[in-house]
């Protein structure tokens, strides 16, 4: 203890227990909320007024904390501004220089950094969606509504720094709300920092000579010891399909109605996700009704989906609100920084959007399509993509080239009257197009043989980046007569 002007004070300590610091934070938050409630009786507070109020409360509480021998960290200022503005921890995350994207998926926050990819950052505060919709509306842009549940907005956010200065950040908000996101709001914020004079002075090609981005985090694929039985896949075929997805390939699952396309796709996707830390792979799922459920999620909008986004279409109803199409949802997906997009059933313009997405780096993607054979996948795809205005203006050879660049492999499933459910064929899609036929080239890797099951054809995968050695699977699994 020591005395200043007759006042007894404890020595200020920077190191305090987490419980004590949390208690002081609660005092700060309670007093901030109380003062805001009083001020709000007169008028609605602007973001600048909330910042001033938060700094004032921080100074007042800090003086009392010093009397008790505690020094409150200045980071509490930004945390308090977030608390009072309804932004919660979002403001602190936007302020961080290493974060490029922030995702609010139902009740949970994920952040994307160049070094670590997607990571879970904790629960989202209640009312965060309301706060963001107000921000969008005040900026004179269209906020999402149940009639128009998808919105894309570009805002400027003034982020207060602890030293009293303010940093301008650009935030692009992609917002999907019910009914398009049936379990709750799905929001992605892409954060960009405006360059300061200091940045421009020190930002030159010298940085590129000294630094580089780290490798994309990807686990080494080790073939799984799947049991051999009377199922539709052999261990060899299962490991090939799984390795393709783990390495960021795009898979087409084709078949007739009721053949089990969706179920097979779901099992392959889940096995792929299990190779990564939970939440590290972000998938955007688009369906007419939600059938694909991953990561053991129970459908509760307050529980963590593991960074999986579930969206559904809304059909056109005469006299009702505008439809929400798969095309709309995929375009929204591409603003959400997903690793992959999954379509329950491609039958229109959305098929072309997915191909374009897969060709530009959104691997780990998959879609199902109705077809009567593996060879029929191409003409069926060519038929459905004509609904897209861009594809309708392109030649068949151009569409074939895009398909070949994007799709890694295709699986054909049928429910046979004699044999039941079978995988009739698994083909690799070559990057080389058959120009005379104006179609992609399919190389059969596994074919169903009556009495034997799904057997290797002897062809080896030759697609660059997806050869046996690239996939870390033995070439022997493709040997005919295995």
Per-segment meaning from a language model:
Residues 102, 175, 362, 407:
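Residue-level signature of catalytic and energy-coupling elements of molecular machines
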Residues 1-161:
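N-terminal accessory targeting/assembly segments
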Residues 260:
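Conserved glycine(s) of the Walker
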Residues 410-412:
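Short, well-ordered beta-strand core segments
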Residues 104-106, 113, 155, 177-179, ...:
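Flexible glycine-/small-residue-rich
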Residues 238, 248-254, 263, 267-404, ...:
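Switch/coupling sub-region of P-loop NTPases
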Residues 116-126, 133, 137-247:
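P-loop NTP-binding catalytic core
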Residues 418-482:
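NTP-binding/hydrolysis catalytic cores, primarily Walker-type P-loop NTPases
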């Amino acid at each position: 203890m020591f005395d200043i002007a007759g006042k007894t004070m404890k020595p200020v300590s920077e190191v305090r227990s987490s419980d004590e610091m949390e208690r002081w934070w609660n005092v700060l938050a309670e007093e901030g909320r109380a003062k805001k409630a009083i001020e709000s009786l007169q008028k609605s507070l602007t973001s600048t007024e909330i910042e001033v109020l938060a700094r004032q409360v921080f100074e007042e509480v800090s003086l009392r904390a010093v009397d008790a021998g505690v020094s409150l960290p200045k980071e509490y200022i930004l945390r308090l501004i977030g608390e009072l503005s309804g932004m919660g921890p979002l403001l602190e995350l936007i302020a961080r220089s290493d974060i490029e994207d922030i995702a609010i998926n139902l009740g949970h926050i994920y952040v994307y950094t160049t070094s670590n990819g997607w990571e879970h950052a904790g629960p989202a505060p209640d009312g965060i969606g309301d706060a963001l919709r107000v921000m969008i509306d005040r900026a004179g842009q269209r906020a999402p509504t149940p009639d128009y549940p998808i919105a894309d907005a570009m805002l400027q956010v003034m982020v207060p720094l602890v030293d009293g200065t303010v940093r301008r950040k650009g935030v692009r908000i992609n917002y999907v709300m019910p009914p398009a996101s049936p379990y709750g709001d799905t929001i992605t914020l892409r954060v960009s920092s405006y360059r300061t004079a200091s940045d421009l002075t020190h930002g030159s090609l010298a940085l590129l000579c000294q630094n580089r981005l780290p490798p994309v985090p990807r686990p080494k694929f080790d073939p799984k010891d799947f049991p051999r039985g009377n199922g539709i896949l052999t261990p060899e075929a299962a490991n090939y399909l799984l390795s393709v997805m783990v390495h960021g390939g795009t898979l087409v699952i084709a078949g007739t109605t009721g053949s089990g396309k969706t179920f097979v796709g779901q099992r392959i996707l889940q096995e792929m996700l299990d190779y990564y830390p939970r939440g590290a792979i972000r998938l955007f799922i688009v369906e007419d009704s939600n059938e694909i459920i991953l990561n053991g999620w129970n459908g509760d909008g307050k529980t963590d989906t593991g960074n999986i986004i579930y969206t559904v279409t809304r059909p056109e109803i005469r006299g009702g609100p505008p439809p929400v199409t798969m095309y709309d949802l995929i375009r929204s997906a591409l603003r959400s920084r997903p690793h992959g997009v999954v379509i329950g059933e491609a039958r229109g313009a959305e098929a072309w959007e997915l191909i374009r997405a897969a060709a530009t780096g959104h691997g780990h993607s998959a879609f199902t399509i109705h077809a009567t054979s593996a060879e029929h996948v191409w003409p069926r795809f060519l038929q459905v993509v004509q609904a897209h205005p861009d594809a309708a203006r392109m030649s068949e050879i151009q569409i074939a080239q895009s398909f070949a660049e994007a799709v890694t492999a295709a699986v054909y499933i049928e429910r046979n009257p004699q044999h039941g459910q079978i995988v009739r064929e698994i083909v690799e899609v070559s990057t080389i197009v058959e120009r005379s036929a104006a179609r992609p080239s399919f190389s059969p890797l596994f074919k169903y043989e009556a009495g034997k099951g799904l057997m290797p054809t002897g062809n080896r995968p030759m697609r660059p980046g997806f050869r046996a050695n690239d996939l870390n699977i033995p070439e022997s699994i493709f040997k005919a007569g295995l």
